[in-house]
């Protein structure tokens, strides 16, 4: 198309409307018609040609909406986050945080990052997105829930130490949150999962048991109490098994007094544990020596 003002041919597809208001309306109309890719292009034009206009933040928001309409969820998250980073005055901040949270939940539910139809072998994007939601929310209504979900996502990725740290933040940062009880339980569960398999190092097992006991004491009405008690019993069994093997080790080394102490500890601390029976038998044998 020939333009007398510029005295040259211009591709109509590359042209921009005379004002940011008109350009935004044009992009919004394309979005409403579900012409998402075209809407994205027009939003980009507005941001490029009118970067300081008030409408630039709305263009960025509609670009994110259009990516979401195209089911490009990670790109949508990135575009939403740009509104927060570049246009902190935007009236859309609370709305954007909720949209980012929803995108994170989609990835938690199994959505994958893709290029075209090809799934990318990358870390679950929910981890990155939830970290941003927590940062963006500060002490907002979604903050503690996002913090809890971050812990759950890390736990599902078998990153138990990181998950445990994030769960603990729910209680320390948002002590009045409805998610504190669940987070305490999950933190204890993560501690039990990272307890070493070695029977000679029981510190993390003891710590996990202590956390479950604290949970039961502080949340006596919690729905998870029954499961927590079951996990305490399992950890007691594990602790007793470890003590039994340590006692047997000392006995083989002919350090009978040390062995006696560990056998007695099993009987005193967990008299109904499976390891208690052999511990009693061993003590009787040691009495004869």
Regions found by a protein language model. Give the residues of each.
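Acidic, polar-rich low-complexity tracts and alpha-helical solenoid repeat scaffolds
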Residues: 1-289
């Amino acid at each position: 198309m020939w333009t007398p003002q510029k005295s040259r041919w211009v591709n109509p597809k590359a042209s921009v409307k005379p004002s940011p208001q008109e350009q935004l309306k044009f992009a919004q109309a394309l979005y409403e018609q579900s012409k998402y890719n075209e809407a994205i292009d027009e939003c980009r034009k507005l941001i490029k040609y009118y970067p300081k206009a008030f409408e630039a933040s709305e263009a960025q928001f509609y670009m994110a909406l259009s990516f979401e309409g195209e089911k490009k969820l990670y790109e949508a998250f990135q575009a939403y986050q740009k509104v927060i980073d570049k246009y902190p005055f935007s009236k859309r901040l609370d709305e954007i945080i909720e949209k980012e949270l929803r995108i994170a939940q989609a990835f938690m539910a199994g959505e994958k990052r893709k290029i075209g139809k090809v799934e990318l072998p990358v870390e679950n994007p929910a981890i990155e997105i939830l970290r941003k939601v927590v940062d963006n929310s500060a002490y907002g209504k979604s903050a503690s829930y996002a913090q809890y979900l971050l812990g759950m996502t890390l736990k599902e990725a078998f990153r138990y130490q990181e998950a445990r740290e994030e769960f603990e933040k729910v209680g320390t940062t948002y002590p009045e949150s409805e998610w504190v009880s669940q987070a305490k339980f999950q933190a204890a569960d993560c501690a039990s999962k990272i307890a070493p398999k070695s029977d000679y190092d029981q510190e993390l097992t003891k710590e996990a048991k202590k956390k479950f006991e604290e949970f039961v004491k502080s949340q006596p009405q919690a729905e998870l109490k029954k499961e927590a008690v079951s996990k305490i019993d399992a950890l007691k069994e594990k602790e007793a098994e470890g003590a039994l093997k340590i006692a047997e080790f000392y006995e083989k080394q002919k350090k009978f007094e040390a062995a006696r102490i560990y056998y007695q500890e099993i009987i005193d601390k967990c008299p109904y544990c499976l390891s208690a029976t052999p511990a009693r038998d061993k003590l009787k044998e040691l009495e004869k020596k």
